[in-house]
Amino acid sequence: EFRRVLFRSIPEVVHEFHTSTQGLDVDTAAKRLHENGPNRFDEAKKDSLAKKILRSLMDFTTIVLLVAAAISFYTAIATDHGDYFEGLLIIAIVVINSVLAIYQEGNAEKALEALQDMNKQTALVIRDGQQQEINAEELVVGDVLVLENGSMVTADARLIQTSQMRIEESALTGESEAVEKDADFVAEEELPLGDQLNMVFKGCTVVNGRGRGIVTAVGMDTEMGKIAGLLGSNT
């Protein structure tokens, strides 16, 4: 399984991804791009405010509260005691819950938009044995990604070469301290992302050194893509 590259040596990774340390040829890269699609996150559909309100009102708990409010109002009218406080309080709770739900959905949409800005990056790769700059959306699995100090990582990759490389991974791990990477590291057990020393991940930044890596996942298959998928499901 390609996802197990954490446990593979560099020659094994090269073999499994049908590539070389000198990169893919242009024709193979074009074929893989056509077969697997571009290296970008899916764009979530934005619902209208009216649809968001309707969706919040269709929540089971909200429906129960609305029924309770209706019963309270009916009782107040039927008994002619004129005490509508309980019903109004329930309606107020429903309104507050709906506003909070819509607000949280809006925050998720903004976070997803920020992630989608990563679609607009460029990347350095080795193709036909030559280093070249391409649109990051054109990256494919098996590409050799060139990473330099200050570069943003534009796809998940298994490192094959490192020189004093440190990566800032707070976007994924929440850890502010940069992680020193080692292309020769081979894991013997499952590790959290922050301890995967032979891997780099889309959306993280090189803060020192340089290196190269074989792209192992693009777009929604990356670790950052999984986050984008979760955010998209909440909008």
Task: State each model region's role.
Residues R3-T235:
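Conserved cytosolic headpiece of P-type ATPases
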